[in-house]
């Protein structure tokens, strides 16, 4: 993680300079959003304060992570800690200097916000009771965590047409909505062997769409090969021009 941390730490002062340009009126809110989202930061309505979003792969937070977020909230007088629908956590009402301090301390303590917004692989979500749920097919948490780490390891390298969401569900209840996300993995058992069903090209929002089932069962130990291949498919074939609602259209037309 040393090399990753060094790279992420080196980005902070450039981000601070962008933030100061925004605060001084030299940069529009939309232009700032285009740059800040990938850093895990968004300007709030006042135009003077900011929100940060922490990556919590599979919705799992260690006691160390939670204590650090609690410490940030107390230190910077944040009244509410917001838990997102993708199992990340947010702090609001921060100054630019506070944001940069959180970035630096978080990186040094391996709590990251990089890539939690913008056109990047977002927080990997998973069934909330993975590992302890009575009716789960098998524990999907290790695989969701591995994918989250895979994305984080090269988070600063991505150039995507749109944000990229990955989800894991541990049974047919599909609590993580793998059938309506960019890339979804559903745990199944076939002939006594553990596999994942793979779903592609779904999404929620104003233009919701169900995913396409790939028709192939994959072995859990091969999960990163498939994640990397499908991420590259998204990069190479996704639509960079039409806009967010249709970014998967060129891909799904070819495979449906």
Describe each region flagged by the PLM:
Residues 153, 245-246:
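Intrinsic, low-complexity polybasic segments
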Residues 111, 235-236, 252:
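Non-catalytic alpha-helical coupling and interface elements of nucleotide-dependent molecular machines
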Residues 23-27, 49-193, 225:
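Small-residue-enriched alpha-helical segments and adjacent helix-cap loops
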Residues 2, 158-244:
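Mobile "lid/hinge" segments at catalytic clefts and subdomain interfaces of large enzymes
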Residues 1-70:
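Gly/Thr-rich phosphate-binding loop signature of adenosyl cofactor/nucleotide-binding cores
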Residues 248-256:
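Positively charged, low-complexity/disordered segments
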Residues 41-46, 77-83, 236-241:
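Short, flexible, solvent-exposed loop/turn segments with mixed acidic/basic and small polar residues
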């Amino acid at each position: 993680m040393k090399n990753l941390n060094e790279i992420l730490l080196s980005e902070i002062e450039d981000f601070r300079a962008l933030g100061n340009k925004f605060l001084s009126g030299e940069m529009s809110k939309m232009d700032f959003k285009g740059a800040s989202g990938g850093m895990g930061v968004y300007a709030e309505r006042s135009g003077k304060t900011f929100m940060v979003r922490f990556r919590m792969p599979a919705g799992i937070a260690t006691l160390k992570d939670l204590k650090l977020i609690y410490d940030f909230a107390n230190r910077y007088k944040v009244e509410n800690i917001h838990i997102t629908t993708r199992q990340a956590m947010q702090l609001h009402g921060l100054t630019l200097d506070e944001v940069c301090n959180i970035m630096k301390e978080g990186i040094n303590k391996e709590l990251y916000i990089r890539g939690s917004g913008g056109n990047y692989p977002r927080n990997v979500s998973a069934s909330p009771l993975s590992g302890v749920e009575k009716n789960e097919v098998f524990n999907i948490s290790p695989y969701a965590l591995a994918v989250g780490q895979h994305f984080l390891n090269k988070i600063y390298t991505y150039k995507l047409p749109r944000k990229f969401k990955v989800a894991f569900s541990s049974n047919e209840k599909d609590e993580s909505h793998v059938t309506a996300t960019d890339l979804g993995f559903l745990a199944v058992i076939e002939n006594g062997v553990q596999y994942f069903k793979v779903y592609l090209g779904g999404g929620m929002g104003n233009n919701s769409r169900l995913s396409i089932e790939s028709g192939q069962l994959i072995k859990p130990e091969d999960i990163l090969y498939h994640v990397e291949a499908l991420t590259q498919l998204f990069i190479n074939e996704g639509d960079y021009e039409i806009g967010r609602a249709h970014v998967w259209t060129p891909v799904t037309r070819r495979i449906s």
